[in-house]
Amino acid sequence: MIKFLLFLAIAAATVISNAELAVPTASISAHVLDISGGSPAGGIQILAFILLNNGWTNIGSQFTQDNGRVDWVSPDFTLIPGTYRLVYITEPYYTAKNVESFYPYVEVVFNIRNATQHYHVPLTLSPWGYSTYRGS
């Protein structure tokens, strides 16, 4: 029985380690904070695009977790140098809270020149404004 429990503990640690390693260094993550309430904004859909041949190509769609984070917005896409766009769909978030908001969505367009780096794109949000920056 002790050997079996030890096996389960090692297996669980392996799964946790693999989950932590699943997100590559070359990736885009996001974080949404609702500054009007001072809390993370869970449940916001984030769409990811890359500009290819003068048009936007969808490379991923994720929802923020309860902590407001998306660890990897485009898990099925390998980063390449280029222009990217994240679209944070904010209207359903505020509608669910019965709060009027000015922006139905927020678009953030940015350049990736070094596709081997990690890019973190946080959004601080309120019903009447927003701000974004390159995080770490």
Swiss-Prot record:
BP terms from Gene Ontology: purine nucleobase metabolic process
Protein name stated in the entry: Probable 5-hydroxyisourate hydrolase ZK697.8
Signal sequence segment: 1-19
Catalytic activity: 5-hydroxyisourate + H2O = 5-hydroxy-2-oxo-4-ureido-2,5-dihydro-1H-imidazole-5-carboxylate + H(+)
Role this protein plays: Catalyzes the hydrolysis of 5-hydroxyisourate (HIU) to 2-oxo-4-hydroxy-4-carboxy-5-ureidoimidazoline (OHCU).
Annotated InterPro entries: Hydroxyisourate_hydrolase, Thyroxine_BS, Transthyretin/HIU_hydrolase, Transthyretin/HIU_hydrolase_d, Transthyretin/HIU_hydrolase_sf, Transthyretin_CS
Alphabetized UniProt keyword annotations: Hydrolase, Purine metabolism, Signal
Note: HIU hydrolysis also occurs spontaneously, but more slowly.
Family: Belongs to the transthyretin family. 5-hydroxyisourate hydrolase subfamily.
CDD domains documented for this protein: TLP_HIUase (cd05822)
Superkingdom of the organism of origin: Eukaryota
Protein EC: 3.5.2.17
